[in-house]
Curated annotation (Swiss-Prot):
Physiological role: Involved in proper assembly of pre-ribosomal particles during the biogenesis of the 60S ribosomal subunit. Accompanies the pre-60S particles to the cytoplasm.
Domain of life the protein comes from: Eukaryota
Basic residues composition bias: residue spans: 10-30
Name of a matching Pfam family: Alb1
Protein name: Ribosome biogenesis protein ALB1
Gene that encodes the chain: ALB1
Stated family: Belongs to the ALB1 family.
Location in the cell: Cytoplasm; Nucleus
GO cellular component: cytoplasm; nucleus
Keyword Cell inner membrane included in the entry's annotation: no
Region named Disordered: 1-55
Length: 153
């Protein structure tokens, strides 16, 4: 059982969970667009969801385009989050600069260095075949024996 002042007491955990749940509900309610039935009848129509009976007619283009409007948001960054984002951007810029500096030291890679693994394996196998055609099998004439376990002279 948890101690008297422990943070993990069941009562405290249950209270914290229900508190977080209610805060989440309020947060979700702020983000969703309200229906007409849940708001007063004098609420601005732009802030509520359209009714199924509302007109879906599209206005014809008459040549006068509306002025572009900037999108507004009510969500702001906390000071802590803004500092964190700025710090991460500095880290990314420093890492990119470091990569560019190391890339400058190395010469441009040639076509041989850009070969894929498959091309390298093909080249190695063909070189083995060509060496075998030139030299044939190499038999070790060692009195100690060969890898086959028999003596070859």
């Amino acid at each position: 059982m948890a101690g008297r002042n422990a943070i993990n007491k069941p009562k405290i955990k249950l209270h914290a969970q229900s508190h977080a749940k209610s805060l989440g509900r309020k947060r979700a309610a702020r983000r969703t667009t309200a229906t007409r039935s849940s708001t007063s009848r004098y609420a601005a129509k732009g802030t509520t969801a359209p009714r199924p009976t509302d007109s879906k007619a599209v206005a014809l283009y008459t040549g006068n385009a509306p002025q572009p409007t900037s999108t507004m948001t009510t969500q702001t960054l906390s000071n802590k989050r803004a500092k964190k984002i700025a710090r991460n951007q500095r880290y990314l810029a420093a890492n990119k600069l470091k990569e560019n500096e190391t890339a400058m030291e190395v010469d441009n890679t040639s076509e041989q260095e850009k070969q894929t693994k498959l091309d390298q394996i093909k080249k190695a196998l063909w070189s083995v075949i060509e060496n075998h055609q030139k030299n044939g099998y190499s038999v070790v004439s060692d009195p100690e024996g060969t890898t086959l376990g028999i003596q070859s002279f």
